[in-house]
C-alpha cells in the first residue's frame, strides 16, 4: 500500500516541532530538492528530506502503513472524536489513537509546533494533555491539530483486510521526536546533553515508543533506512503482544447469500459446543503467532487499590506494552479480556491490586475453564497482601521501576496454589433462641485462597466494615482506620465477646473430632490457613522443628493448617510468635450452634448457625518471583569457602531520596557514611541486614567512629543502586531474594525514612565556619544578653518574636537551625505561625533541606501549618524550596486539604496544581530511555 502525500497544510516551515513515526509525519522547512539526499530504495516517501547535517528527519509525509479506510459511521479526524483516556474496543476505534491524561508539565512545548499551536492565541494558558502510550504533550485545544501534521500514536492493532489473516507481518518502529531525552544514543553512545533543556525548542533525539531506542537527531546517528526497519519491541519483547496479533474484524453483512449459508449451517450451530460468549461477534479478534520464546502478558489493574497507585501505574504499563494488553478492572472486570485472549499460547497474567483482586481473577479463570490456565503474577497495591508476600512479590508497591517488574514476571517460576471450597448450610439443630436477625445464611465468598477464620479477628473486621458502610466519610484516612481497628479490638477484648467461642462450635478434621482439644484451649479465634502469611505478614504457623508432629507449611500440598489463638498468642503474633497449632488436614466439617462473625479472605459477615464443609477445590497456577542470580559471581562453585566482601554502608534521608533518587551521583554525594561491614560473597540482603544493625552496637566498630551518625530507625530499607537507571527501594519482605553483589558494587546504600536533623548532614554551618557578614552581624558580646537561656531556646524565641537579626546572630554563633521545642516544632514551624516571611526565607536558604518536611507531634509539616493559616506567599516559598505536597498529617490531610478546610479555594487550587506537578515529574523521569 503506497503512502499518501502529506496534505498542503503539513508542508510547513516550522522547524521547531517535528515527529517521525511509523504512523506519523515530520514537519520542517522544505530543503531544495536537488540538494536533499534521498533513500536509494524503490519506495519513496514524499516530503521526506534531510536538512543539511543537523537533523536526521525534518519533515515527512511518512506513512509506513497508510491508515486503514475509516470505519463506516466513525468520525474521521481527531478533532471530531472525543478525547479518550481509555482504550477504545468498539468497532469505530481509530487507528493509532492516543490515550490522553491530564498533565501539568510546563517544560515541554506543544508537540504540534508553533505554527499549528492554537493555545498561544488564547488569553489564558491552556491545559495540557499527555499521551500515555507515546509520551507526547499537547495543549488540549491542539489535539485536533495532530491530524493536520499527520501524527498518530503507535498502532495497537491491524485491519483484517486480507483473506489470509495469518499473513507474515512485522512491527515497524514508531519514531517520535524528543526535545528532552535521557540515556545515550544507540549509535554513537553519547548522551543527549543540551544546555537549558527546560525551555529549549531544539529537537535533540528521535526515539521509538515501542523498543525505546533513541538516537541523536542528526544524520550521522540516525539513518533514513532505519525508518522502515522492523522493530524488535525492545527488552520486553517476550511479554509485549504485537499489534499484528490483534485484528479488527468486520461486522458480518446480512446479504441474501449470507442468509442462505446461515440456514444451511443452522443444524451445526444447534449442536455446537461453543457457549454464548464464544459465539457472539466481537469487534477485535486475536490471531497469535506462537513462539516458545514468548510469554505474552495481560495486565489487570484495580485503580481503587492502594489509593491512587492503581490509576498511576496504568499509565506506565501503557508506555511499556501494547495498550490493548492493559485492562482497567473498573471498566467491566477481567472476563471479556480473558475470553478474547484465551487461545494465546504461553499466556501470563499480572494482577495489580490487593489479594481480593487476585481472587477475582482466579475465580474468573475457574469459570472460563481455560486449558491450560495461565499463571498469575501479582503486583501488590495497598496494604495486607499476604498472598503476594507468600509468592515473594512483597507487601506493597513502593517505587520499583515498571520495567523491572515486567522482567520479574517474565522470569518468575510457575508454582501451584491450593484453593478451597466453602459450603455452608443452615444448622437444623440450632434452636430458635439462637437466631439473630442481623445474621446471614450465606458466606461472602464460596472459595478462599488465603484463610477462613471465625471469632475475635472476624468480629473486629466486621465492626470496621459495618461502620465504614454506614459512615464512609469518617474512614478516608489510613490513620483513622488503624485507630478504629485498635479501639474495636480493645473494646472487644474488654467485653470478651469471643471468649466463649469454643462452647458454640464443633470441629472435625479428616474424621478426627478436635472439639475437646479446642474446649481445653479456649481460643478466641480459629483460623483455617492455606498460606504461611496472615494479618499483613505475620506467620501464625511458625516453623515447627523436627521434634514436633507437624510439617512445615506449604501452599501447594493439599493441606490446611488449623490454628487457635488466645489473646496471649494474638499479642505474641505481632512480635514473631505463633498460634496454637491444632492440626493439618484435607477436609473440615465445622458446625456452629449460634450466629458467629466469620471472614473469608478478609470479607466479613455474621453467619447464622450453620454447617460448613471445607474441601480442596483445585490448584491455581501462579507466578512466584524468583531469587535473582548474580551475573558476575564472585567465586567459582569449586571454592569451599565463599569470598568475603568488605562494603561501605551509607545512609540516605527520605528528603534527599525523594529529591534526588533519579540522579545517582547527587544522591551518592548526599549520603552519610555509617561504616564498613564484612559479609560472605554469596550473602543475601537478609544476612547483610543483621551485619548492618550490629554495626553501631560494636564499641570499636566503624560505626562508632562517626560522631554524626544517629542510630538507625526500625524502618530502614535497602536501596538498589545498580540494576536500574535510578535508585529504588527494596521491600523488606523481598530481601531474601536479592544478593548483596546485585544491588551494590563498592558501597551499599540504605534509606532511613526517619533520618532528620543537622547531624545527618556533615556540611552544615558550625562555629568554625562562619557565614558571610550582613547588616545584622553581631558585635562582640551582643549575644550575652540572653545568656540565661540555652542557645536553642534563644533561637525559638527569636523565631517567635520575628527577630530576624537575633536569629542571624545566633546562627553565626553556631546555633542549630534544626532545633526543636518540646512539641517537636522546628524554627520554621514557629516562623510560619508568626507569619514572618523574612525569617522563613532565611531558614529556607540556610537550614538543611530536612526542615521542609519535618513534622511536629501532631504530624504537621510547616506547609500544613501555612496552608491552614492561608499564608499564600509563605506557601509559595516552601513549595518552591522543594517541600513535599503529598505528606499527610495525623488526620490524613495533605496541605491542599488543609487549605480547603480553611476555605481558601485559590490556595487549595495552587497546592493541587503543584502536587500534581510533583507526581508528573516522578512519572516523566521514570520513563527515561
Curated annotation (Swiss-Prot):
UniProt keywords, alphabetically: ANK repeat, ATP-binding, Cell membrane, Cell projection, Cytoplasm, Kinase, Lipid metabolism, Membrane, Metal-binding, Nucleotide-binding, Nucleus, Phosphoprotein, Repeat, Transferase, Zinc, Zinc-finger
Chain ranges passing through the membrane: none
Coiled-coil stretches noted in the UniProt entry, renumbered to this chain: none
Sequence ranges of Low complexity compositional bias: 15-24
InterPro entries in UniProt: Ankyrin_rpt, Ankyrin_rpt-contain_sf, ATP-NAD_kinase_N, C1_DGKzeta_rpt1, C1_DGKzeta_rpt2, DGK, DGKI-like_dom, Diacylglycerol_kin_accessory
Record field: catalytic activity: a 1,2-diacyl-sn-glycerol + ATP = a 1,2-diacyl-sn-glycero-3-phosphate + ADP + H(+); a 1-O-alkyl-sn-glycerol + ATP = a 1-O-alkyl-sn-glycero-3-phosphate + ADP + H(+); 1-O-alkyl-2-acyl-sn-glycerol + ATP = 1-O-alkyl-2-acyl-sn-glycero-3-phosphate + ADP + H(+); 1,2-didecanoyl-sn-glycerol + ATP = 1,2-didecanoyl-sn-glycero-3-phosphate + ADP + H(+)
Renumbered residue ranges of the record's region Mediates interaction with RASGRP1: 279-417
GO molecular function: alkylglycerol kinase activity; ATP binding; ATP-dependent diacylglycerol kinase activity; enzyme inhibitor activity; kinase activity; zinc ion binding
Zinc finger boundaries on the chain: Phorbol-ester/DAG-type: 98-153, 173-231
Residue span, DAGKc domain: 292-426
Motif PDZ-binding mapped to chain: 925-929
Pfam families, A to Z: Ank_2, C1_1, DAGK_acc, DAGK_cat, DGKI
Domain of life where this protein originates: Eukaryota
Cell location: Nucleus; Cytoplasm, Cytosol; Cell membrane; Cell projection, Lamellipodium
Main location, first listed in the record: nucleus
GO biological process entries: diacylglycerol metabolic process; glycerolipid metabolic process; intracellular signal transduction; lipid phosphorylation; maintenance of postsynaptic density structure; negative regulation of Ras protein signal transduction; negative regulation of T cell receptor signaling pathway; phosphatidic acid biosynthetic process
Motif Nuclear export signal mapped to chain: 362-370
Positions carrying Phosphoserine: 706, 782
EC number: 2.7.1.107, 2.7.1.93
Pathway connected to this protein: Lipid metabolism; glycerolipid metabolism
Biased composition (Basic and acidic residues): 1-14, 25-37
Sequence segments annotated as region (Disordered): 1-46, 59-80, 257-281, 421-441, 760-783
Entry comment, domain topic: The PDZ-binding motif mediates interaction with PDZ domain-containing proteins like SNTG1 and SNX27.
Family indicated by similarity: Belongs to the eukaryotic diacylglycerol kinase family.
Protein name (Swiss-Prot/TrEMBL): Diacylglycerol kinase zeta
Organism: Rattus norvegicus (Rat)
Gene: Dgkz
